[in-house]
Amino acid sequence: MMKNILAIQSHVVYGHAGNSAAEFPMRRLGANVWPLNTVQFSNHTQYGKWTGCVMPPSHLTEIVQGIAAIDKLHTCDAVLSGYLGSAEQGEHILGIVRQVKAANPQAKYFCDPVMGHPEKGCIVAPGVAEFHVRHGLPASDIIAPNLVELEILCEHAVNNVEEAVLAARELIAQGPQIVLVKHLARAGYSRDRFEMLLVTADEAWHISRPLVDFGMRQPVGVGDVTSGLLLVKLLQGATLQEALEHVTAAVYEIMVTTKAMQEYELQVVAAQDRIAKPEHYFSATKL
């Protein structure tokens, strides 16, 4: 059965971030994506200027009411949330999650707790980080912080892989069954590799791939693609190891394609065949 995912995150008209980054790769893996946009901007914010607007929180709820009115909400297998335009949007998203789970008790909530990196040009509204700590985390089935977001969620520093696994299990004690640490950065084993962890109460998997050097301007949307693809693989029944290995390879294919084409925006369309069938392989290690 084809899986249906309600994806609630940002949208850019030009380029790739949020739904504009994740939607096509998720579809290329065989999932139906229902994109619901928290913001519509001309382009992503790392350009330093953009136009567009944040959607009113009620807009999100209204759209989902419309899907419920045609009796299709029970076919939704998961809700994915990413970049929020406001903390109030987060409250509405949790209401949507409750509504989806009432219609389909098997549905999952995947929270990508985007909290902003001012130095990277990713800006989030006041209250969004607090929303994720207090409400998003306990409501989620799967949560996918990067290292900075992991430290905010567990409220202490994380300095190495062992501490990251323990921190992920602290989050699991508060609600989610699965934690993806989608960029270990300085807490990883190696400074010249890109490393991730996938953790449950009784399993922990580590994977690494080469860093792709883009100089000063790193492409945006890598985390959005990573979260979306992981959710698709898990819904399709992949094991933790299989899901982590495929996602790591697929994202690497997008990165090397983007660099080879000398582009700043992720080249998800050009890399589409290698998203579905990656040419590279990276092996996950059980910790």
From Swiss-Prot:
Signal peptide: none annotated. Pathway: Cofactor metabolism; pyridoxal 5'-phosphate salvage; pyridoxal 5'-phosphate from pyridoxal: step 1/1. It catalyses: pyridoxal + ATP = pyridoxal 5'-phosphate + ADP + H(+). Pfam families: Phos_pyr_kin. Its EC number is 2.7.1.35. The keyword Lipoprotein does not apply. ATP binds at residues 112, 144, 149, 182, 209-212. GO terms for biological process: pyridoxal 5'-phosphate salvage; pyridoxal metabolic process; vitamin B6 biosynthetic process. One of its GO terms (cellular component) is cytosol. InterPro entries: PM/HMP-P_kinase-1, PyrdxlKinase, Pyridoxal_kinase_PdxY, Ribokinase-like. Keywords: ATP-binding, Kinase, Magnesium, Nucleotide-binding, Transferase. It comes from the Bacteria. One of its GO terms (molecular function) is pyridoxal kinase activity. Substrate binds at residues 10, 45-46, 224. Its cofactor is Mg(2+). Disruption phenotype: Cells lacking this gene and cells lacking both pdxY and pdxK are not auxotrophs, meaning that the de novo pathway of PLP biosynthesis is functional. For PLP salvage, the pdxY single mutant can use both pyridoxine and pyridoxal, the pdxK single mutant can use pyridoxal but not pyridoxine, and the double mutant can no longer use both compounds. Belongs to the pyridoxine kinase family. PdxY subfamily. Homodimer. Pyridoxal kinase involved in the salvage pathway of pyridoxal 5'-phosphate (PLP). Catalyzes the phosphorylation of pyridoxal to PLP in vivo, but shows very low activity compared to PdxK. Displays a low level of pyridoxine kinase activity when overexpressed, which is however not physiologically relevant. This is Pyridoxal kinase PdxY. It comes from Escherichia coli (strain K12).
